[in-house]
Protein backbone atom coordinates (compact mmCIF):
# COMPACT_ATOMS: atom_id res chain seq x y z
CA UNK A 1 0.00 0.00 0.00
CA UNK A 2 2.89 2.39 0.79
CA UNK A 3 4.40 1.64 -2.65
CA UNK A 4 1.07 2.38 -4.32
CA UNK A 5 0.73 5.61 -2.35
CA UNK A 6 4.24 6.68 -3.41
CA UNK A 7 3.31 6.38 -7.09
CA UNK A 8 0.25 8.60 -6.74
CA UNK A 9 2.05 11.13 -4.53
CA UNK A 10 4.85 11.86 -7.00
CA UNK A 11 5.45 15.52 -7.90
CA UNK A 12 7.42 17.09 -10.76
CA UNK A 13 9.62 20.08 -11.34
CA UNK A 14 9.10 22.31 -14.37
CA UNK A 15 11.82 21.91 -16.99
CA UNK A 16 14.35 24.72 -17.22
CA UNK A 17 13.57 25.18 -20.90
CA UNK A 18 10.13 26.47 -20.05
CA UNK A 19 8.49 23.94 -22.30
CA UNK A 20 5.36 22.21 -21.08
CA UNK A 21 6.16 18.96 -19.31
CA UNK A 22 4.20 16.56 -17.22
CA UNK A 23 4.78 13.79 -14.74
CA UNK A 24 4.44 10.73 -16.94
CA UNK A 25 4.56 8.29 -14.04
CA UNK A 26 1.73 10.02 -12.20
CA UNK A 27 -0.42 10.78 -15.26
CA UNK A 28 -0.18 7.31 -16.78
CA UNK A 29 -0.76 5.68 -13.37
CA UNK A 30 -4.01 7.48 -12.61
CA UNK A 31 -5.25 7.07 -16.19
CA UNK A 32 -4.49 3.34 -16.20
CA UNK A 33 -6.30 2.90 -12.90
CA UNK A 34 -9.36 4.69 -14.27
CA UNK A 35 -9.10 2.60 -17.44
CA UNK A 36 -9.41 -0.58 -15.37
CA UNK A 37 -13.11 0.20 -15.47
CA UNK A 38 -12.83 -0.43 -19.20
CA UNK A 39 -11.04 -3.74 -18.59
CA UNK A 40 -13.90 -4.99 -16.45
CA UNK A 41 -16.45 -3.53 -18.85
CA UNK A 42 -14.89 -5.54 -21.70
CA UNK A 43 -14.60 -8.77 -19.71
CA UNK A 44 -18.10 -8.64 -18.30
CA UNK A 45 -19.59 -7.73 -21.67
CA UNK A 46 -18.08 -10.65 -23.59
CA UNK A 47 -17.64 -13.46 -21.05
CA UNK A 48 -21.31 -14.39 -21.31
CA UNK A 49 -20.82 -15.44 -24.94
CA UNK A 50 -18.55 -18.35 -23.97
CA UNK A 51 -20.64 -19.32 -20.96
CA UNK A 52 -23.89 -19.18 -22.95
CA UNK A 53 -24.02 -22.79 -24.28
CA UNK A 54 -23.44 -24.17 -20.78
CA UNK A 55 -25.57 -21.99 -18.47
CA UNK A 56 -28.50 -22.33 -20.90
CA UNK A 57 -28.42 -26.10 -20.40
CA UNK A 58 -27.87 -25.74 -16.65
CA UNK A 59 -30.88 -23.44 -16.19
CA UNK A 60 -33.01 -25.38 -18.70
CA UNK A 61 -33.55 -22.49 -21.11
CA UNK A 62 -31.87 -24.00 -24.19
CA UNK A 63 -35.28 -24.35 -25.88
CA UNK A 64 -36.62 -20.97 -24.79
CA UNK A 65 -35.56 -18.10 -27.09
CA UNK A 66 -37.31 -15.62 -24.81
CA UNK A 67 -35.30 -16.62 -21.75
CA UNK A 68 -32.11 -16.84 -23.81
CA UNK A 69 -32.64 -13.30 -25.06
CA UNK A 70 -33.41 -12.09 -21.54
CA UNK A 71 -30.19 -13.61 -20.19
CA UNK A 72 -28.19 -11.90 -22.96
CA UNK A 73 -29.90 -8.51 -22.77
CA UNK A 74 -30.69 -7.96 -19.08
CA UNK A 75 -27.22 -6.48 -18.56
CA UNK A 76 -28.10 -3.85 -21.17
CA UNK A 77 -30.98 -2.67 -19.02
CA UNK A 78 -28.52 -2.27 -16.17
CA UNK A 79 -26.21 -0.35 -18.52
CA UNK A 80 -28.96 2.16 -19.29
CA UNK A 81 -29.64 2.80 -15.61
CA UNK A 82 -25.96 2.90 -14.70
CA UNK A 83 -25.15 5.36 -17.49
CA UNK A 84 -27.84 7.89 -16.57
CA UNK A 85 -27.41 7.69 -12.81
CA UNK A 86 -23.62 7.92 -13.12
CA UNK A 87 -23.67 11.13 -15.13
CA UNK A 88 -25.93 12.98 -12.74
CA UNK A 89 -24.12 11.71 -9.65
CA UNK A 90 -20.69 12.40 -11.17
CA UNK A 91 -21.50 16.08 -11.68
CA UNK A 92 -22.83 16.33 -8.14
CA UNK A 93 -20.47 14.12 -6.11
CA UNK A 94 -17.39 13.84 -8.32
CA UNK A 95 -15.82 11.33 -10.67
CA UNK A 96 -13.77 9.33 -8.16
CA UNK A 97 -16.67 8.13 -5.94
CA UNK A 98 -18.47 6.74 -9.00
CA UNK A 99 -15.35 4.88 -10.12
CA UNK A 100 -15.16 3.30 -6.66
CA UNK A 101 -18.83 2.35 -6.81
CA UNK A 102 -18.40 0.75 -10.23
CA UNK A 103 -15.43 -1.27 -8.95
CA UNK A 104 -17.48 -2.56 -6.02
CA UNK A 105 -20.38 -3.44 -8.33
CA UNK A 106 -18.08 -5.36 -10.68
CA UNK A 107 -16.66 -7.34 -7.75
CA UNK A 108 -20.10 -8.16 -6.36
CA UNK A 109 -21.55 -9.07 -9.75
CA UNK A 110 -18.61 -11.32 -10.69
CA UNK A 111 -19.08 -13.39 -7.56
CA UNK A 112 -22.88 -13.45 -7.60
CA UNK A 113 -23.29 -14.39 -11.27
CA UNK A 114 -21.23 -17.53 -10.83
CA UNK A 115 -22.58 -18.39 -7.39
CA UNK A 116 -26.33 -18.45 -8.00
CA UNK A 117 -28.12 -21.63 -9.07
CA UNK A 118 -31.54 -20.03 -9.58
CA UNK A 119 -32.12 -18.36 -12.94
CA UNK A 120 -33.92 -15.30 -11.54
CA UNK A 121 -30.97 -14.56 -9.24
CA UNK A 122 -28.57 -15.13 -12.13
CA UNK A 123 -30.50 -12.46 -14.06
CA UNK A 124 -30.33 -10.10 -11.07
CA UNK A 125 -26.56 -10.52 -10.89
CA UNK A 126 -26.22 -9.84 -14.64
CA UNK A 127 -28.39 -6.74 -14.23
CA UNK A 128 -26.11 -5.55 -11.43
CA UNK A 129 -23.08 -6.11 -13.63
CA UNK A 130 -24.77 -4.05 -16.33
CA UNK A 131 -25.05 -1.12 -13.91
CA UNK A 132 -21.29 -1.38 -13.35
CA UNK A 133 -20.70 -1.37 -17.11
CA UNK A 134 -22.98 1.65 -17.55
CA UNK A 135 -21.07 3.61 -14.91
CA UNK A 136 -17.58 2.66 -16.07
CA UNK A 137 -18.26 3.09 -19.80
CA UNK A 138 -18.86 6.81 -19.39
CA UNK A 139 -16.88 7.69 -16.28
CA UNK A 140 -13.53 6.14 -17.17
CA UNK A 141 -12.94 8.06 -20.44
CA UNK A 142 -14.38 11.24 -18.94
CA UNK A 143 -12.02 11.12 -15.96
CA UNK A 144 -9.03 10.45 -18.23
CA UNK A 145 -9.93 13.36 -20.53
CA UNK A 146 -10.15 15.71 -17.54
CA UNK A 147 -6.75 14.82 -16.07
CA UNK A 148 -4.75 14.27 -19.28
CA UNK A 149 -2.53 17.01 -20.80
CA UNK A 150 -3.86 18.21 -24.16
CA UNK A 151 -0.91 16.88 -26.19
CA UNK A 152 -1.54 13.27 -25.13
CA UNK A 153 -5.25 13.38 -24.27
CA UNK A 154 -6.34 11.35 -27.30
CA UNK A 155 -3.70 8.73 -26.64
CA UNK A 156 -4.65 8.40 -22.97
CA UNK A 157 -8.40 8.25 -23.57
CA UNK A 158 -7.66 5.57 -26.17
CA UNK A 159 -6.03 3.59 -23.35
CA UNK A 160 -9.54 3.10 -22.01
CA UNK A 161 -10.51 1.34 -25.24
CA UNK A 162 -7.28 -0.68 -25.05
CA UNK A 163 -8.25 -1.96 -21.61
CA UNK A 164 -11.76 -2.72 -22.92
CA UNK A 165 -10.36 -4.90 -25.69
CA UNK A 166 -7.87 -6.48 -23.28
CA UNK A 167 -10.85 -7.33 -21.09
CA UNK A 168 -12.62 -8.77 -24.13
CA UNK A 169 -9.55 -10.83 -25.03
CA UNK A 170 -9.17 -11.92 -21.41
CA UNK A 171 -12.76 -13.17 -21.38
CA UNK A 172 -12.28 -14.97 -24.69
CA UNK A 173 -9.08 -16.67 -23.49
CA UNK A 174 -10.67 -17.54 -20.14
CA UNK A 175 -13.65 -19.10 -21.89
CA UNK A 176 -11.38 -21.08 -24.21
CA UNK A 177 -9.11 -22.32 -21.39
CA UNK A 178 -11.84 -23.06 -18.86
CA UNK A 179 -14.13 -24.96 -21.22
CA UNK A 180 -13.08 -28.60 -21.40
CA UNK A 181 -13.08 -30.29 -24.84
CA UNK A 182 -16.54 -31.50 -25.84
CA UNK A 183 -16.64 -34.98 -27.41
CA UNK A 184 -18.47 -35.07 -30.72
CA UNK A 185 -20.98 -37.66 -29.47
CA UNK A 186 -22.03 -35.66 -26.38
CA UNK A 187 -25.74 -34.94 -26.11
CA UNK A 188 -27.07 -31.76 -24.48
CA UNK A 189 -27.74 -33.83 -21.34
CA UNK A 190 -24.12 -35.00 -21.32
CA UNK A 191 -22.85 -31.43 -21.66
CA UNK A 192 -25.14 -30.27 -18.85
CA UNK A 193 -23.84 -33.02 -16.55
CA UNK A 194 -20.20 -32.33 -17.44
CA UNK A 195 -17.81 -29.99 -15.65
CA UNK A 196 -18.55 -27.32 -18.27
CA UNK A 197 -22.27 -27.46 -17.55
CA UNK A 198 -21.94 -27.55 -13.75
CA UNK A 199 -18.88 -25.45 -12.86
CA UNK A 200 -17.08 -24.24 -15.99
CA UNK A 201 -19.47 -21.41 -16.79
CA UNK A 202 -19.29 -20.24 -13.15
CA UNK A 203 -15.50 -19.89 -13.29
CA UNK A 204 -15.82 -17.88 -16.49
CA UNK A 205 -17.77 -15.24 -14.55
CA UNK A 206 -15.60 -15.51 -11.43
CA UNK A 207 -12.58 -14.63 -13.57
CA UNK A 208 -13.49 -10.94 -13.22
CA UNK A 209 -13.33 -10.94 -9.42
CA UNK A 210 -9.55 -10.49 -9.06
CA UNK A 211 -9.16 -7.50 -11.43
CA UNK A 212 -12.28 -5.96 -9.86
CA UNK A 213 -10.66 -6.19 -6.41
CA UNK A 214 -7.45 -4.63 -7.76
CA UNK A 215 -9.45 -1.82 -9.37
CA UNK A 216 -11.29 -1.16 -6.11
CA UNK A 217 -8.00 -0.97 -4.18
CA UNK A 218 -6.12 1.25 -6.64
CA UNK A 219 -9.05 3.62 -7.22
CA UNK A 220 -8.79 4.62 -3.56
CA UNK A 221 -5.48 6.34 -4.32
CA UNK A 222 -6.29 8.36 -7.45
CA UNK A 223 -7.13 12.08 -7.08
CA UNK A 224 -10.44 13.67 -7.94
CA UNK A 225 -10.73 15.30 -11.37
CA UNK A 226 -9.18 18.79 -11.17
CA UNK A 227 -11.78 20.20 -13.56
CA UNK A 228 -14.62 18.94 -11.38
CA UNK A 229 -12.89 20.38 -8.31
CA UNK A 230 -12.50 23.77 -10.03
CA UNK A 231 -16.12 23.69 -11.18
CA UNK A 232 -17.19 23.17 -7.56
CA UNK A 233 -15.02 26.05 -6.30
CA UNK A 234 -12.41 23.82 -4.63
CA UNK A 235 -9.52 25.89 -5.96
CA UNK A 236 -6.72 24.63 -3.71
CA UNK A 237 -7.48 20.97 -4.34
CA UNK A 238 -7.78 21.55 -8.08
CA UNK A 239 -4.46 23.43 -8.14
CA UNK A 240 -2.81 20.65 -6.15
CA UNK A 241 -3.85 17.98 -8.66
CA UNK A 242 -2.88 20.09 -11.69
CA UNK A 243 0.54 20.87 -10.21
CA UNK A 244 1.14 17.17 -9.58
CA UNK A 245 0.28 16.51 -13.21
CA UNK A 246 2.47 19.20 -14.80
CA UNK A 247 4.08 21.51 -12.26
CA UNK A 248 3.15 25.02 -11.17
CA UNK A 249 3.35 26.66 -14.60
CA UNK A 250 1.11 23.99 -16.13
CA UNK A 251 -1.32 24.31 -13.21
CA UNK A 252 -1.50 28.10 -13.67
CA UNK A 253 -2.21 27.85 -17.41
CA UNK A 254 -4.81 25.09 -17.07
CA UNK A 255 -6.48 26.73 -14.09
CA UNK A 256 -6.86 30.04 -15.95
CA UNK A 257 -8.54 28.31 -18.90
CA UNK A 258 -10.88 26.36 -16.63
CA UNK A 259 -11.88 29.51 -14.73
CA UNK A 260 -12.45 31.48 -17.96
CA UNK A 261 -14.99 28.95 -19.22
CA UNK A 262 -16.58 28.57 -15.77
CA UNK A 263 -16.84 32.23 -14.83
CA UNK A 264 -20.33 33.72 -14.60
CA UNK A 265 -22.00 30.68 -16.08
CA UNK A 266 -24.89 28.69 -14.70
CA UNK A 267 -24.71 25.28 -13.15
CA UNK A 268 -24.88 22.34 -15.50
CA UNK A 269 -27.69 19.86 -15.82
CA UNK A 270 -30.12 18.39 -18.32
CA UNK A 271 -31.90 21.73 -18.77
CA UNK A 272 -28.66 23.46 -19.75
CA UNK A 273 -27.55 20.53 -21.90
CA UNK A 274 -30.77 20.66 -23.95
CA UNK A 275 -30.70 24.46 -24.30
CA UNK A 276 -30.12 25.99 -27.75
CA UNK A 277 -26.32 26.57 -27.56
CA UNK A 278 -25.69 22.92 -26.69
CA UNK A 279 -28.15 21.18 -29.03
CA UNK A 280 -25.84 20.88 -32.02
CA UNK A 281 -22.99 19.30 -30.07
CA UNK A 282 -25.43 17.06 -28.17
CA UNK A 283 -26.90 15.74 -31.44
CA UNK A 284 -23.36 15.18 -32.72
CA UNK A 285 -22.43 13.24 -29.58
CA UNK A 286 -25.56 11.08 -29.67
CA UNK A 287 -25.08 10.19 -33.35
CA UNK A 288 -21.40 9.34 -32.80
CA UNK A 289 -22.33 7.15 -29.81
CA UNK A 290 -25.17 5.30 -31.53
CA UNK A 291 -23.17 4.81 -34.72
CA UNK A 292 -20.42 3.05 -32.76
CA UNK A 293 -23.01 0.35 -32.06
CA UNK A 294 -25.07 0.44 -35.26
CA UNK A 295 -21.96 0.00 -37.41
CA UNK A 296 -22.53 -3.66 -36.51
CA UNK A 297 -19.14 -4.82 -35.27
CA UNK A 298 -20.30 -5.59 -31.75
CA UNK A 299 -22.69 -8.29 -32.98
CA UNK A 300 -19.58 -10.23 -33.96
CA UNK A 301 -18.62 -10.35 -30.28
CA UNK A 302 -22.14 -11.02 -28.98
CA UNK A 303 -23.05 -13.59 -31.63
CA UNK A 304 -19.61 -14.86 -32.66
CA UNK A 305 -20.68 -18.46 -32.04
CA UNK A 306 -23.58 -18.20 -34.50
CA UNK A 307 -21.57 -16.24 -37.08
CA UNK A 308 -18.69 -18.73 -37.19
CA UNK A 309 -20.97 -21.77 -37.08
CA UNK A 310 -22.89 -20.40 -40.06
CA UNK A 311 -19.49 -20.22 -41.82
CA UNK A 312 -19.01 -23.96 -41.27
CA UNK A 313 -17.03 -24.22 -38.00
CA UNK A 314 -17.65 -26.62 -35.08
CA UNK A 315 -18.17 -25.36 -31.52
CA UNK A 316 -14.59 -26.24 -30.53
CA UNK A 317 -13.15 -24.35 -33.50
CA UNK A 318 -15.47 -21.43 -32.84
CA UNK A 319 -13.97 -20.76 -29.39
CA UNK A 320 -10.47 -20.63 -30.89
CA UNK A 321 -11.61 -18.36 -33.75
CA UNK A 322 -13.16 -16.02 -31.19
CA UNK A 323 -9.77 -15.73 -29.46
CA UNK A 324 -8.22 -14.85 -32.85
CA UNK A 325 -10.69 -11.98 -33.22
CA UNK A 326 -9.80 -10.80 -29.72
CA UNK A 327 -6.07 -10.74 -30.54
CA UNK A 328 -6.77 -8.69 -33.67
CA UNK A 329 -8.89 -6.34 -31.57
CA UNK A 330 -6.00 -5.68 -29.18
CA UNK A 331 -3.33 -5.30 -31.87
CA UNK A 332 -5.27 -2.74 -33.88
CA UNK A 333 -6.29 -0.77 -30.79
CA UNK A 334 -2.56 -0.14 -30.37
CA UNK A 335 -2.63 1.23 -33.92
CA UNK A 336 -5.34 3.69 -32.83
CA UNK A 337 -3.30 4.79 -29.82
CA UNK A 338 -0.30 5.41 -32.08
CA UNK A 339 -2.23 7.31 -34.76
CA UNK A 340 -4.88 9.28 -32.85
CA UNK A 341 -2.56 12.26 -32.22
CA UNK A 342 -0.97 11.97 -35.68
CA UNK A 343 -3.90 11.46 -38.05
CA UNK A 344 -6.54 13.04 -35.83
CA UNK A 345 -9.98 11.91 -34.69
CA UNK A 346 -11.92 12.87 -37.83
CA UNK A 347 -9.67 10.98 -40.26
CA UNK A 348 -9.85 7.79 -38.18
CA UNK A 349 -13.64 7.97 -37.89
CA UNK A 350 -13.92 8.37 -41.67
CA UNK A 351 -11.51 5.48 -42.17
CA UNK A 352 -13.55 3.26 -39.87
CA UNK A 353 -16.93 4.03 -41.40
CA UNK A 354 -15.70 3.73 -44.98
CA UNK A 355 -13.63 0.63 -44.33
CA UNK A 356 -16.46 -1.23 -42.58
CA UNK A 357 -18.90 -0.31 -45.37
CA UNK A 358 -16.64 -2.07 -47.86
CA UNK A 359 -15.86 -5.08 -45.66
CA UNK A 360 -19.52 -5.71 -44.82
CA UNK A 361 -20.44 -5.47 -48.48
CA UNK A 362 -17.93 -8.22 -49.29
CA UNK A 363 -18.90 -10.27 -46.21
CA UNK A 364 -22.58 -10.16 -47.11
CA UNK A 365 -21.80 -11.15 -50.68
CA UNK A 366 -19.77 -14.14 -49.44
CA UNK A 367 -22.70 -15.27 -47.29
CA UNK A 368 -24.99 -14.85 -50.32
CA UNK A 369 -22.80 -17.17 -52.40
CA UNK A 370 -22.36 -19.54 -49.38
CA UNK A 371 -18.61 -19.08 -49.10
CA UNK A 372 -17.30 -20.80 -45.95
CA UNK A 373 -14.07 -21.55 -44.15
CA UNK A 374 -10.90 -19.54 -43.59
CA UNK A 375 -11.74 -16.63 -45.91
CA UNK A 376 -14.78 -15.79 -43.78
CA UNK A 377 -12.60 -15.67 -40.66
CA UNK A 378 -10.26 -13.28 -42.50
CA UNK A 379 -13.15 -10.94 -43.34
CA UNK A 380 -14.41 -10.98 -39.75
CA UNK A 381 -10.90 -10.23 -38.45
CA UNK A 382 -10.56 -7.38 -40.97
CA UNK A 383 -13.85 -5.89 -39.76
CA UNK A 384 -12.71 -6.07 -36.14
CA UNK A 385 -9.30 -4.62 -37.03
CA UNK A 386 -10.92 -1.70 -38.86
CA UNK A 387 -13.26 -1.04 -35.93
CA UNK A 388 -10.50 -1.37 -33.32
CA UNK A 389 -8.27 1.25 -34.93
CA UNK A 390 -11.06 3.76 -35.46
CA UNK A 391 -14.67 3.72 -34.27
CA UNK A 392 -14.04 1.66 -31.13
CA UNK A 393 -11.58 3.94 -29.31
CA UNK A 394 -12.10 7.26 -31.12
CA UNK A 395 -15.80 7.42 -30.22
CA UNK A 396 -14.89 7.56 -26.54
CA UNK A 397 -12.18 10.16 -27.22
CA UNK A 398 -14.66 12.42 -29.00
CA UNK A 399 -17.41 12.03 -26.41
CA UNK A 400 -14.98 12.90 -23.63
CA UNK A 401 -13.71 15.99 -25.50
CA UNK A 402 -16.62 17.80 -27.14
CA UNK A 403 -18.68 18.78 -24.07
CA UNK A 404 -17.95 21.68 -21.66
CA UNK A 405 -16.81 20.99 -18.12
CA UNK A 406 -20.05 22.07 -16.48
CA UNK A 407 -22.23 19.60 -18.43
CA UNK A 408 -19.69 16.89 -19.23
CA UNK A 409 -21.03 14.43 -16.68
CA UNK A 410 -24.67 14.63 -17.72
CA UNK A 411 -23.70 14.90 -21.41
CA UNK A 412 -21.55 11.77 -21.24
CA UNK A 413 -24.40 10.06 -19.42
CA UNK A 414 -26.88 11.05 -22.13
CA UNK A 415 -24.60 9.90 -24.95
CA UNK A 416 -23.69 6.69 -23.12
CA UNK A 417 -27.39 6.06 -22.52
CA UNK A 418 -27.98 6.52 -26.27
CA UNK A 419 -25.06 4.20 -26.99
CA UNK A 420 -26.53 1.43 -24.85
CA UNK A 421 -29.99 1.94 -26.40
CA UNK A 422 -28.25 1.51 -29.74
CA UNK A 423 -26.48 -1.58 -28.43
CA UNK A 424 -29.75 -3.07 -27.17
CA UNK A 425 -31.40 -2.38 -30.53
CA UNK A 426 -28.48 -3.95 -32.38
CA UNK A 427 -28.36 -7.02 -30.14
CA UNK A 428 -32.13 -7.50 -30.22
CA UNK A 429 -32.55 -7.03 -33.98
CA UNK A 430 -29.58 -9.10 -35.20
CA UNK A 431 -31.26 -12.53 -34.80
CA UNK A 432 -34.50 -11.11 -36.24
CA UNK A 433 -32.69 -9.67 -39.27
CA UNK A 434 -30.65 -12.84 -39.63
CA UNK A 435 -33.85 -14.92 -39.75
CA UNK A 436 -35.76 -12.59 -42.06
CA UNK A 437 -32.98 -11.52 -44.44
CA UNK A 438 -30.23 -14.08 -43.92
CA UNK A 439 -26.66 -13.27 -42.92
CA UNK A 440 -25.99 -11.62 -46.28
CA UNK A 441 -28.92 -9.21 -46.02
CA UNK A 442 -28.02 -8.32 -42.44
CA UNK A 443 -24.45 -7.37 -43.27
CA UNK A 444 -25.59 -5.43 -46.35
CA UNK A 445 -27.78 -3.36 -44.03
CA UNK A 446 -24.79 -2.70 -41.76
CA UNK A 447 -22.82 -1.67 -44.85
CA UNK A 448 -25.50 0.88 -45.76
CA UNK A 449 -25.48 2.26 -42.20
CA UNK A 450 -21.70 2.69 -42.42
CA UNK A 451 -22.07 4.61 -45.69
CA UNK A 452 -24.47 6.97 -43.92
CA UNK A 453 -21.99 7.34 -41.05
CA UNK A 454 -19.17 8.16 -43.45
CA UNK A 455 -21.21 10.90 -45.14
CA UNK A 456 -22.31 12.35 -41.79
CA UNK A 457 -18.76 12.48 -40.42
CA UNK A 458 -17.52 14.02 -43.66
CA UNK A 459 -20.03 16.84 -43.29
CA UNK A 460 -20.47 17.41 -39.56
CA UNK A 461 -17.55 16.03 -37.51
CA UNK A 462 -14.96 18.63 -36.40
CA UNK A 463 -11.32 17.85 -35.65
CA UNK A 464 -10.49 18.04 -31.93
CA UNK A 465 -6.81 17.05 -32.05
CA UNK A 466 -4.40 19.38 -30.25
CA UNK A 467 -7.06 21.61 -28.67
CA UNK A 468 -7.64 22.04 -24.94
CA UNK A 469 -11.06 21.15 -23.56
CA UNK A 470 -11.70 24.83 -22.89
CA UNK A 471 -10.73 25.83 -26.46
CA UNK A 472 -13.10 23.18 -27.80
CA UNK A 473 -15.89 24.65 -25.70
CA UNK A 474 -15.33 28.07 -27.27
CA UNK A 475 -15.29 26.53 -30.77
CA UNK A 476 -18.31 24.24 -30.42
CA UNK A 477 -20.70 26.08 -28.07
CA UNK A 478 -22.00 29.21 -29.78
Where are these regions (language model features)?
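Alpha-helical transmembrane bundle of multi-pass membrane proteins
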Residues: 7-8, 15-235, 241-243, 263-478
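Short phosphate-engaging motifs
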Residues: 237, 250
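Extended, hydrophobic alpha-helical segments
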Residues: 242-246, 258-259
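Short, well-structured alpha-helical segments
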Residues: 251-260
